[in-house]
Every structure is written in C-alpha cells, then in structure tokens.
From Swiss-Prot:
It comes from Arabidopsis thaliana. Component of the NF-Y/HAP transcription factor complex. The NF-Y complex stimulates the transcription of various genes by recognizing and binding to a CCAAT motif in promoters. Acts as a central regulator of the embryogenesis. Required for the speciation of cotyledon identity and the completion of embryo maturation. Controls seed storage protein genes through the regulation of FUS3 and ABI3. Involved in the blue light (BL) and abscisic acid (ABA) signaling pathways. Keywords: Abscisic acid signaling pathway, Activator, DNA-binding, Nucleus, Transcription, Transcription regulation. Residues 203-238 are annotated as: Disordered. SUPFAM superfamilies: Histone-fold. This is Nuclear transcription factor Y subunit B-9. Heterotrimeric transcription factor composed of three components, NF-YA, NF-YB and NF-YC. NF-YB and NF-YC must interact and dimerize for NF-YA association and DNA binding. Interacts with PRN1.
C-alpha cells in the first residue's frame, strides 16, 4: 500500500544557497556540501563552510509505531483472526492523523491563551470542537479516575492514609471516597443480629441473645463459640 504525503508540511524547504549548490556542483555529496569563500587579501586562503542537509522527518517517525497499532487491533479480535498489511497501515495512518489533528487544535488554544503546556482539558475541548463529542464524556470519567489514583499513590508515598477504595472486578473500575469508621452502637451495644431482623423486622440484642429460648427458634439448637451463643441460620428449614 503506497501512502501519499499527509505530513508533507513537516518537510523543511531548501534555502536559495542550497539550491544553487545543487545546480552548480559537479560532484554533490549526499550528506554534506562545502562552500569555499575566498579571503579579501589572499586568494589562496579560504574559509570552508559546511552546509548541513535539510532536516526532513522520516516517515516512520511521523506515524504511531506499527507494533502498538497491531496490539490494539488484536485486543478486539479473536485469537485466530489475521490482519492484512494494508489494514495495519490504514489504521496506523488514521490514528496518527487523528492524534495530529486533535493535538494541533489544542495547541492553537494554548497559543491564544499564551500557555506552554497542553492539558487534558485542552484535548477534550479540541475533540468537542472538532465534532468528537461521543468521546468527551467517557474520557472525562477516565481522566478523573486517573487523577484520583495518582493522588492516592502520592499519598501512599508520603505516608498518608489512603482513601477508602472499593474495587469491583478486575477491570480497575472502582469507587473512591473518604474513609469512614464504625457506626455508633445501638441501645444494646455491639451485638449479633437477630434472624427476625433479617426477615423484615427485629431488634439488636446484646451478646446475640434474643430473649427467647433457643429451642423455640426454628426448632434447632445452636452451639456456643467462645462463650457467645451462635445462631443456627438453617434452623428454620429443619
């Protein structure tokens, strides 16, 4: 697949002196060329000025690495699927153009506001302005989560207590919030929860005592662990 020249504006044009050297030099060198400037008083003395070649960005440096492109594409494909070379290059050029497009728009905003650093808000603003509104909300959630993780990591390095983090599953999506202590004890102190409370109405009883005979609850008996009566959760099915 032959590519065009989407990044041709990155190539620096040759200067007038370099064009004259290319036209009048009989033995041009590919790397450097020299210009001999004669001295005003002595014709034998001259100053050799080395001319550097024009800085032209290589094509492979203008695109996202193909290995990264293939890795991202394979995440959404089954293991037995194959990707042709032209498909890889098409996605590579598309992703590279997209990055350049959004970054250029964000850079213009920074220049108007006389700022040197492009922030995440600049990228989101540029994407919204260019019509990529569907990406703004998910990326906003991602950026907020990323900043919270970085804040917790910095607190851990400084020895500060991290915030309460409850992670759901293995995908890294979690809830971050302030740490909370135990709730205040009830009128009977810290005790065990009666089964009648689980069924929709009951009370807290200190030391797990419900005020009833154990044999009358579900018709079963419960054992004692460390001096505390343990409730038989399956007594109602006996």
């Amino acid at each position: 697949m032959e590519r065009g020249a989407p990044f041709s504006h990155y190539q620096l044009p040759k200067s007038i002196s370099e064009l004259n050297l290319d036209q009048h030099s009989n033995n041009p060198t590919p790397m450097t060329s020299s210009v001999v400037v004669a001295g005003a008083g002595d014709k034998n003395n001259g100053i050799v000025v080395q001319q550097q070649p024009p800085c032209v960005a290589r094509e492979q440096d203008q695109y996202m690495p193909i290995a990264n492109v293939i890795r991202i594409m394979r995440k959404t494909l089954p293991s037995h699927a194959k990707i042709s070379d032209d498909a890889k290059e098409t996605i590579q050029e598309c992703v590279s153009e997209y990055i350049s497009f959004v970054t250029g728009e964000a850079n213009e905003r920074c220049q108007r506001e006389q700022r040197k650093t492009i922030t995440a808000e600049d990228i989101l603003w540029a994407m919204s302005k260019l019509g990529f509104d569907n990406y703004v909300d998910p990326l906003t959630v991602f950026i907020n989560r990323y900043r919270e993780i970085e804040t917790d990591r910095g607190s851990a390095l400084r020895g500060e207590p991290p915030s309460l983090r409850q992670t759901y599953g293995g995908n890294g999506i979690g809830f971050h919030g302030p740490s909370h202590g135990l709730p205040p004890p009830g009128p009977y102190g810290y005790g065990m929860l009666d089964q009648s409370m689980v069924m929709g109405g009951g009370r807290y009883y200190q030391n797990g005592s419900s005020g009833q005979d154990e044999s009358s609850v579900g018709g079963g008996s419960s054992s004692s662990i460390n001096g505390m009566p343990a409730f038989d959760h399956y007594g109602q099915y006996k």
